[in-house]
Curated annotation (Swiss-Prot):
Residues holding Mn(2+) 2: D124, H126, D232, D234
Pathway named in the protein's UniProt entry: Nitrogen metabolism; urea cycle; L-ornithine and urea from L-arginine: step 1/1
InterPro entries: Arginase (IPR014033), Ureohydrolase (IPR006035), Ureohydrolase_dom_sf (IPR023696), Ureohydrolase_Mn_BS (IPR020855)
Name of this protein: Arginase-1
Keywords, comma-separated and alphabetical: Arginine metabolism, Cytoplasm, Hydrolase, Manganese, Metal-binding, Phosphoprotein, Urea cycle
Sequence positions bearing Phosphoserine: S7, S72, S163, S217
Disulfide bridge positions per record: none
Residues at which substrate binds: H126, T127, D128, I129, N130, T137, G138, N139, D183, T246, E277
């Protein structure tokens, strides 16, 4: 594979209040400790580290109906959106280290401020498209897409802390891969809006190669545009990423996950990346934590050109002997 260096802006989003399980705020630290930045630099990437966001406690963050921590989630996402927009204005690919998946609201909103024509590939066991009125858990990490879709604008009530969010995606701008745990209301939304998805049924039937071909044809067929990849590590089977909050059996294999990211790299269009829901507290053993973190790191590296076939710099390695 040919070698092209890229400039990346990394921002940690150590946030956990979009869901009930502590520990996911440790995700960014775990990914950094695993040498992610050094490995990207080895790949000749120009890496600028924007550090980790600090999230102040929001007092009196009472539920909105059953939606939990709405002001905390809203404020954290506003902070993240501002930094992602800055990274994009500087011409870098944004890399968000989560943190729970509610932070995709800020990541994609900030990205869309600078590249309003972006499209989204969402790799996840779940659609995360419940609205504040359809959610059965009240956890905002199961709702980010509903806040981002223009077609759902009229279905979203005024949630305290989230009134700043302006929907920036149309239903035709997103493709899901890896779905296998979809609520009835979410399935209704997918079908009613005609959202393109490849559940594990389609992955099994078509194979991951055809899935990626069809996803690119659907999103990029008419016009090449920036890709935002939002990757929840629970998209992979829990064998590969056990340390995560909502694991679902029968997921993507390690190889399928890496293939997705390799193919996105090859388009040359990756403009924003989220790697979400790594929760070091939820590994049953230290090895499970290491396995999850190392898998997440490998997914990120493949997005930036680390290829299983190998690669090389554009130099002549076969100079004749002197």
């Amino acid at each position: 594979m040919s070698f092209k260096s890229q400039s990346i802006g990394i921002i940690g989003a150590p946030f956990s209040k979009g869901q009930p399980r502590g520990g996911v705020e440790e995700g960014p630290t775990a990914l950094r400790k695993a040498g992610l930045l050094e490995k990207l630099k080895e790949q000749e990437c120009d890496v600028k580290d924007y550090g980790d966001l600090c999230f102040a406690d929001v007092p009196n963050d009472t539920p909105f109906q059953i939606v939990k921590n709405p002001r905390s989630v809203g404020k954290a996402n506003q902070q993240l959106a501002d930094v992602v927009a800055e990274i994009k204005k500087n011409g870098r690919t944004s890399l968000v280290l989560g943190g729970d998946h509610s932070m995709a609201i800020g990541s994609i909103s900030g990205h869309a401020r600078v590249h309003p024509d972006l499209c989204v590939i969402w790799v996840d066991a779940h659609t995360d498209i419940n609205t504040p009125l359809t959610t059965t858990t009240g956890n905002l990490h199961g709702q980010p897409v509903s806040f981002l879709l223009k077609e759902l604008k009229e279905k979203i009530p005024e949630v305290p802390g989230l009134s700043w969010v302006t929907p920036c995606l149309s239903a035709k701008d997103i493709v899901y891969i890896g779905l296998r745990d979809v609520d009835p209301a979410e399935h209704y939304i997918l079908k009613t809006l005609g959202i393109k998805y490849f559940s594990m049924i389609e992955v099994d039937k078509l194979g991951i190669g055809k899935v990626m071909e069809e996803a690119f044809s659907y999103l990029l067929g008419r016009k090449k545009r920036p890709i935002h990849l939002s990757f929840d590590v629970d998209g992979l089977d829990p064998f590969f990423t056990p340390a995560t909050g909502t694991p679902v059996h029968g997921g993507l294999s390690y190889r399928e996950g890496i293939y997705i990211t390799e193919e996105i790299y090859k388009t040359g269009l990756l403009s924003g990346l989220d790697i979400m829901e790594v929760n070091p507290s939820l590994g049953k053993t230290p090895e499970e934590v290491t396995r999850t973190v190392n898998t997440a790191v490998a997914l990120v590296l493949a997005c930036f050109g680390v290829a299983r076939e190998g690669n090389h710099k554009p130099i002549d390695y076969l100079k004749p002997p002197k």
